[in-house]
Amino acid sequence: MSTQAVTGVLVDSWATKSRVRNAVLVLGLTGFTALAAQVAIPLPFTPVPLTLQTFAVLAGAAALGAERAVLAQILYITLAVAGAPVLAGGASGREVVVGATGGYLIGFVLASYVVGKVSSRGASTKSATTALAFVTGSFVIYALGAPWLAYTTGNTITWAVINGVARS
């Protein structure tokens, strides 16, 4: 008895591929990320609020794969720069995107790629591998977010790691 390896991301196992479908999936993940950003808890010790965005980014990448997830996050950031109130607390604008949270937003794009690539190799069907992909994706987000937070706030990297990673 042989078993066939499962490859591809979750969404590809139940839906036929088409450009329209891909566009809807990208728009859906963009919307999911924007909604998750609205679940924001301001923290008194950092300008970066605690949100559900990281979960939306990682889950979306695992479900949709790297290409669609990266496009969704680029669209999300583009909408924010254009003035759509999609960031935490309904914030928007170029100054917000390049502000304290900018590194995390760029991290969303790179984490989407990493988690999406791992998931496209069948990881989205294995809990342990998916968990490891999520941890790796979170590391990517924080590895870009913390230094950017330190730079934009004029604080040390130690302060940024404590206040922008460890406490969140």
Q: Where are these predicted regions, by residue range?
A:
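Alpha-helical membrane segments and adjacent membrane-interface helices in multi-pass membrane proteins
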Residues: V39-V114
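Hydrophobic residues within alpha-helical transmembrane segments
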Residues: G28, I74-T78, L110, L132, ...
